[in-house]
């Protein structure tokens, strides 16, 4: 089993020193879901929500969150992201919204936390915008779909077991 990289021999939390690592292109994708009633989803789809364009607001919130991950997650490094993408898809057959985020950079550390933060904050924004019409929406699951670049190698969710 791998060791926890943020914990030293004394069990204390520390930011990982990446100064000796090579710069490589790194990319990560994450997804989150927001389950809701059909009527709530219909308001989002047809644009009749009184707060405005829910998807546009959630997309911008997710992008902003990815850029500020280092301020939210204590041991994350500040990163110069070269790409952040947040896509939202209404899935009326499941009464939910699927959010997929992508983050990319050329750097010394991965962007998994940025992708996860983008997807989660986009989901939270949907909840915030729609809570006046439905308070029992469910956020989740949230997960990393894939990562590439870096010493630990590539990772991709085995979608055959979804």
Swiss-Prot record:
The active site is at 128. One of its GO terms (molecular function) is cyclic pyranopterin monophosphate synthase activity. It catalyses: (8S)-3',8-cyclo-7,8-dihydroguanosine 5'-triphosphate = cyclic pyranopterin phosphate + diphosphate. CDD domains: MoaC_PE. Keywords: Lyase, Molybdenum cofactor biosynthesis. InterPro entries: MoaC, MoaC_bact/euk, MoaC_sf, MoCo_biosynth_MoaA/MoaC, Mopterin_CF_biosynth-C_dom. Homohexamer; trimer of dimers. Disulfide bonds: none annotated. It comes from Klebsiella pneumoniae (strain 342). This is Cyclic pyranopterin monophosphate synthase. Substrate binds at residues 75-77, 113-114. Gene3D superfamilies: Molybdopterin cofactor biosynthesis C (MoaC) domain. Transmembrane segments: none annotated. The keyword Lyase applies. PANTHER family: MOLYBDOPTERIN COFACTOR SYNTHESIS PROTEIN A. Catalyzes the conversion of (8S)-3',8-cyclo-7,8-dihydroguanosine 5'-triphosphate to cyclic pyranopterin monophosphate (cPMP). Belongs to the MoaC family. Pathway: Cofactor biosynthesis; molybdopterin biosynthesis. It comes from the Bacteria. Pfam families: MoaC. Its EC number is 4.6.1.17. GO terms for biological process: Mo-molybdopterin cofactor biosynthetic process.
């Amino acid at each position: 089993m791998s060791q926890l990289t943020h914990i030293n021999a004394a069990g204390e939390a520390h930011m990982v020193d990446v100064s000796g690592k090579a710069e490589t292109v790194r990319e990560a994708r994450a997804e989150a879901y927001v389950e809701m009633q059909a009527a709530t989803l219909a308001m989002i789809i047809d644009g009749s929500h009184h707060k405005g364009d829910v998807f546009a607001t959630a997309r911008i919130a997710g992008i902003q969150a990815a850029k500020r991950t280092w301020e939210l997650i204590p041991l994350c490094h500040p990163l110069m992201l070269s790409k952040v993408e947040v896509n939202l898809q209404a899935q009326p057959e499941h009464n939910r919204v699927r959010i997929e985020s992508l983050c990319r950079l050329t750097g010394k550390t991965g962007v998994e936390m940025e992708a996860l933060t983008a997807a989660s904050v986009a989901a939270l924004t949907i909840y915030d915008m729609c809570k006046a019409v439905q308070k029992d929406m469910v956020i989740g699951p949230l997960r990393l779909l894939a990562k590439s670049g870096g010493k630990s190698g590539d990772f991709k969710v085995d979608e055959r077991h979804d």
